[in-house]
Amino acid sequence: MYLCPSFIKKLIMDVPFIYGRLAERESFIDRVEDRKELKNFLRHGINVILVSPRRWGKSSLVRTSMEELMQEDQQTKVCFLDASKIHTEEEFYNKFASTVIQGVSSTLEQKLSDLVKFINRFTPSITIASDPMNSIKVNLKVNPIKESPENILQLPERIAEAKGIKIIVCIDEFQQLANLPTWKNLEAMLRAEWQLQHHTTYCLYGSKTHMMKDIFNKASSPFFKFGQLMNLKRIAKEYWIPYIVNNFEHTGKSISESQAECLCERVKYNSWYVQQYSFFLWSHTEKKVTQALLDQQLQLVLDTNEDLFLTEIDELTPTQIGMLKAIASGEKHFNAKDIVEKYGLGQPQSITRNKKVLVEKDLVEKHIQDFSFVDPVFELWLKREYNILPIGIENRTKSVVNETMSNYKK
């Protein structure tokens, strides 16, 4: 069965809640001040390091802000690179070059011309995709031992100077590069080359908060004080509630403000989960949301994400799982004898090590006096899975929400 692109586009537009892809236009919520700040820094040549847990909307924020900036300033070009699937230094150079050429040149002819003009020290193989954007992929066959990869890192600056433009390079999941075997050398080279560029600015962002902070906050790191650090906050309920209520109304359905607030609080205003939970609730509501539907669809959210959570649990030791259960139960004194015995936390050195491991895995976040879960739905799922609250799931929803929200209300 063939579905024409216009029908598919209309079908997507008719769905009021979007997750799993970048939020655009009507689907993009608030972030007014964040957009303003991000554009202001990058417009004036200040590098930005954007940090927040996964699924908070960093990629959508950057994409929306940069599209606005390019409309406001025709002399600014933006290049977007996703580092999440880069596994070698050579792959990084190839993607970096492709991204820059793709971002600064609007036509296929310009792309090919720029390749010949600016990448003359290498012999690239070129793949041209048959799509409306005239996508280009470049394979430079760079050998970091024999070649000078600095030339690739200087590419956006050379193009910016030659064309009389400003270039902003946005690299998503930047911390993935720290997993490369050659990271230490690459890290030093990136900083050395990028800090000398005056027409190119960098926006580096990622969801592994612990790794991002290690790269940019440690005084011994080459990237220490590389740019302005922005910690993305949750979108406030003042924006979420009318968004949810209005989207239900526009599709002939209804949800009360108190129900919309309850939905948001259950997933702690996490952008991905608010959209996912709202979509499930909207798609299962004929006319009016009921409390039963609200509870049932929360369970669907937990069930839908269960495979991911099971994978994360499978990678943990029994004492680390015990630590998660203790944190989920609100415990703070992990070395107390009764707590150690109750949750099977092991020896003192294991407790210390497991705290560090769980933080490094971005499963929990350390505060002054306690720990909290990074992923709110993972916490709810964990409580359900291990029956931490000894009451029926339908009846315990409010208790779970109240308990898990207590550490987040300010």
Which sequence ranges carry the predicted segments?
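Sensor-1/coupling segment of RecA-like P-loop NTPase cores
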Residues: 161-163, 167-170, 176-182, 189-220
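P-loop NTPase nucleotide-binding core
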Residues: 53-56, 60-168, 200
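Alpha-helical sensor/transducer elements of the RecA-like P-loop NTPase core
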Residues: 60, 198-249
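A short, basic N-terminal segment
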Residues: 1-53, 68-74, 391, 395, ...
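Amphipathic alpha-helical "lid/sensor" segments that cap RecA-like P-loop NTPase cores
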Residues: 241, 245-307, 318, 368
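Conserved nucleotide-binding/hydrolysis micro-motifs of P-loop NTPases
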Residues: 45, 84-88, 176, 207-211, ...
